[in-house]
Swiss-Prot record:
F-type ATPases have 2 components, CF(1) - the catalytic core - and CF(0) - the membrane proton channel. CF(1) has five subunits: alpha(3), beta(3), gamma(1), delta(1), epsilon(1). CF(0) has three main subunits: a, b and c. One of its GO terms (cellular component) is proton-transporting ATP synthase complex. It comes from the Bacteria. It is a peripheral membrane protein. This is ATP synthase epsilon chain. Gene3D superfamilies: F0F1 ATP synthase delta/epsilon subunit, N-terminal. Its main location: membrane. The lineage of its organism: Bacteria, Pseudomonadati, Pseudomonadota, Alphaproteobacteria, Hyphomicrobiales. It comes from Rhodopseudomonas palustris (strain HaA2). Produces ATP from ADP in the presence of a proton gradient across the membrane. The keyword Cytoplasm does not apply. NCBIfam families: ATP_synt_epsi, PRK13448.1. Keywords: ATP synthesis, Cell inner membrane, Cell membrane, CF(1), Hydrogen ion transport, Ion transport, Membrane, Transport. Pfam families: ATP-synt_DE_N.
Amino acid sequence: MATFHFDLVSPEMVAFSGEVDQVDIPGAEGDFGVLAGHAPVVAVIRPGILTVTAGGAQQKIVVLGGIAEVSEKGLTVLADVATATADVDMQDFAETITTMEQQLPGKVGDELDRSIERLDHYKSIQHQLSTTAMH
């Protein structure tokens, strides 16, 4: 399988940089996979789990929004936050969800809609992480 270069960058660090076979991205308009030779595209990333496949092994990384750019040079993801699933503190993540829920009553209109959507994404990540941890 052909490989391509992938960089995953967050404000804190370069979370990943190297040659990969495939990257599956949680896009705002739907999840999508990137392989070598993918058409150029820029896409918004929603909070979710990004999966990197390289050399037959998979690495899963929680991203909490950002931008993905596919070009002839490869794939670059600029993530708001990028944390390996093994490094996620489940208690802190649950507390973040609780705080988000408590803040909902103070929001209206579009702000409320965006907050509910973000909360739903966080709950989905929490479910995926807890399901993965059980296997």
